[in-house]
């Protein structure tokens, strides 16, 4: 059976959790391959809203094993707060497994994240301050602490001693902050060791053996394509690769075992934090999309920036990830609009760009070229086929499919798991 990847095709918050949850009852493993608790997603089950950060959306599917992959950076305190919160509401998290090779976020990573953002001033990236970037820096710099290290306190201590020699120099001499003690960091991590130990696995072997048994593995990328450290709007990006290729690296599942790559896009566009956003709306319409769509960050509560659908970005995302399918979410948010603009090209200094400009400077100065589509007023939350939609809504969906260059296989028409039009099976087809 296949390995399937779900990827955000914009700047995050597209509804990946809903897509994962929709498929979760039919898959055997749900994997989070990258990111940390800097990106949250919301899943609505039976009218009840669950806000997840570190845990894969599949944690709410009792028949699927949830796996936090090697590409994730884990704040253990945040992890167990999330687990305890779900269990207090009756959820079963006993099917969670964690890669031994995933890295751990230390208290000094969070401090460094926060003080470095303040140090950058106007050049700040707009991080969540949760230590994700500094943890990835230590991973690449070979100063990182991995999940498996809590199984051996002596190794953990050696690694922390090495890391703090550098971190304390930065904190004290550059940022005028206090130094961290080795003992306090060792005690912090060892305080989670007993709860972590039963969950720790060789996730590469676990997932590949599942595929050998013809079981279905679903990988849910965090963040999104345009937050990818290589392919995103650099430097306003995350510190990992939340594209389809990153799912392979962050899970240990080889690329030839991946048969479906599903891109998730809103029927409009949102972004959190700093960075270019050609179709951004600063007027009452932007506020309408924000309010109607509930566009506030799961982690921070920050209001999201809102704008129209960008077909140029959609085509580029399809290329980068090799999308086989698109899942359009929140079509219902557009209900009631008399006209819906879609960005079909850019103009930069009088020159038209039908595809993404090569440089970030040009993208930063891009002015959208719009094509307008007629809206609809009918309630679409009960639609379960494209034919159930008003004609103008059908035309809008077909236009997005044509402009993105990728088939649309599902459309979200409301907040609940069941508020979805499935055009074609996302597993069997």
From Swiss-Prot:
Reactions accelerated catalytically: IMP + L-aspartate + GTP = N(6)-(1,2-dicarboxyethyl)-AMP + GDP + phosphate + 2 H(+)
Residues at the active site: 13, 41
Give the protein's cofactors.
Mg(2+)
| Location of the protein in the cell | Cytoplasm
Q: Which InterPro entries match?
A: Adenylosuccin_syn_GTP-bd, Adenylosuccin_syn_Lys_AS, Adenylosuccinate_synth_dom1, Adenylosuccinate_synth_dom2, Adenylosuccinate_synth_dom3, Adenylosuccinate_synthetase, P-loop_NTPase
Q: Which domain of life is it from?
A: Bacteria
Q: Which residues of this UniProt protein bind GTP?
A: 12-18, 40-42, 304, 330-332, 412-414
Annotated binding of IMP, by residue: 13-16, 38-41, 128, 142, 223, 238, 302
Gene Ontology biological process terms from the UniProt entry: 'de novo' AMP biosynthetic process; IMP metabolic process
Q: Which residues bind substrate?
A: 298-304
What is the first-listed, main subcellular location in coarse terms? cytoplasm
The record's keywords, sorted A to Z, are: Cytoplasm, GTP-binding, Ligase, Magnesium, Metal-binding, Nucleotide-binding, Purine biosynthesis
NCBIfam families under this entry? Answer: PRK01117.1, purA
User: Self-association or partners: how does it assemble?
Assistant: Homodimer.
By sequence similarity, the record places it as follows:
Belongs to the adenylosuccinate synthetase family.
Q: What does this protein do?
A: Plays an important role in the de novo pathway of purine nucleotide biosynthesis. Catalyzes the first committed step in the biosynthesis of AMP from IMP.
The protein in question is named Adenylosuccinate synthetase
